[in-house]
Amino acid sequence: MRIAVLEDSLIQQERIRNLLDLSHRLCFFCTVEEYMESHFYFDLLLLDIELGSQNGIEFIKKHPDKQRFIVYVSSHSEAMADTFDTNVLGFIIKDRIEDALVEKVNQVEQRIHQLEKIALNLPYETRYVYR
């Protein structure tokens, strides 16, 4: 799974890097501009809300299609209600990142796996084909 991390704190980037295993392809970005300049499409964007002078929520409203799913990672729990949209799958408070990040990434990975599965209904069984 290709994961982008849009987080302006290098300390938080390192926390995320240490929590996720090496089976994921991680790309880290400090600014919205860096993220937009990348030529990749991401399965998941781990997104901070406060990015210096920029706002992650406003960014997603303007650019919803560069990633399949979004999980916000922020210390601004009061903004949680403003984050949810069709492709937002969660909100992790930074103080609880060690408890929640791996589980949430696994949930996203399972969701992607389900979306990529095609059922073939054969006469005596159902077979699944994965894209």
Predicted regions: what they are:
Residues 48:
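Active-site residues of response regulator receiver
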Residues 76-92:
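Alpha4 helix (beta4-alpha4-beta5 surface) of REC/receiver domains from two-component response regulators
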Residues 103-131:
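Conserved binding/recognition cores within well-folded domains
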